[in-house]
């Protein structure tokens, strides 16, 4: 093969055209850039979700100057475990363990995943975690709206530059209503939920 990145094709064959290694490397870098851009477009619901922050509860509004980078719909489940209440011997409650969800673009194609941390991971491998800033009540039977301040992203890609994440339009996900007592201590139960996640940056 020498300096060539590919084996020369037969006339009329389906093999890729011969390219010098330097040319191939440049092409691969370009494809990598295009791939990240494509993922960003996929994550950014098309058309991108419009958010009127002034209409949201004040605790979950993003700071002035933040702009929507992308938005996704999360569909998954939240796990709860029946545990004894802290400092309340003999009393039990459903304790939050963590979420697992798939993130979808507007075309309903998966573009990433969400899991305990909280952490959002794009299909390109870039990911962000963060710390909860505030919550605000949602409609009865739904988990609250939430504002998270993101830590620095890990990996170049769709999540790079994200500074805040909002959880909006929540459906379900609240703790089970089934009994939680000494006989069910340690039992885990998954509850389905949906939410829109809106990612902001400067």
Locate each region found by the language model.
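Short, Lys/Arg-enriched N-terminal segments with co-localized hydrophobic residues
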Residues: 3-27
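Primary mode marks residue(s) on the alpha4-beta5-alpha5 output face of response regulator receiver
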Residues: 49-79, 86-202
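Exposed boundary/loop context
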Residues: 3-6, 35, 118
């Amino acid at each position: 093969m020498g300096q060539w990145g590919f084996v020369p094709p037969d006339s009329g064959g389906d093999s890729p055209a011969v390219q010098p290694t330097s040319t191939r490397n440049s092409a691969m870098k370009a494809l990598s850039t295009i791939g990240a851009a494509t993922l960003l477009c996929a994550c950014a619901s098309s058309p991108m979700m419009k958010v009127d922050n002034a209409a949201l509860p004040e605790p979950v509004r993003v700071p002035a100057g933040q702009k929507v980078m992308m938005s996704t719909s999360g569909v998954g489940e939240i796990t709860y475990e029946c545990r004894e209440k802290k400092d309340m011997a003999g009393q039990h409650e459903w304790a939050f363990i963590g979420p697992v969800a798939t993130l979808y673009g507007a075309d309903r194609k998966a573009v990433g995943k969400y899991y305990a941390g909280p952490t959002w991971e794009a299909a390109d491998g870039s990911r962000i975690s963060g710390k909860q800033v505030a919550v605000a009540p949602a409609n009865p039977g739904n988990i609250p709206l939430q504002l998270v301040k993101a830590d620095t992203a890990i990996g170049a890609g769709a999540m790079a530059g994200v500074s805040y994440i909002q959880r909006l339009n929540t459906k379900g996900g609240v703790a089970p209503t089934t009994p939680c007592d000494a006989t069910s201590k340690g039992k885990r139960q998954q509850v389905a939920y949906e939410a829109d996640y809106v990612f902001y940056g400067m």
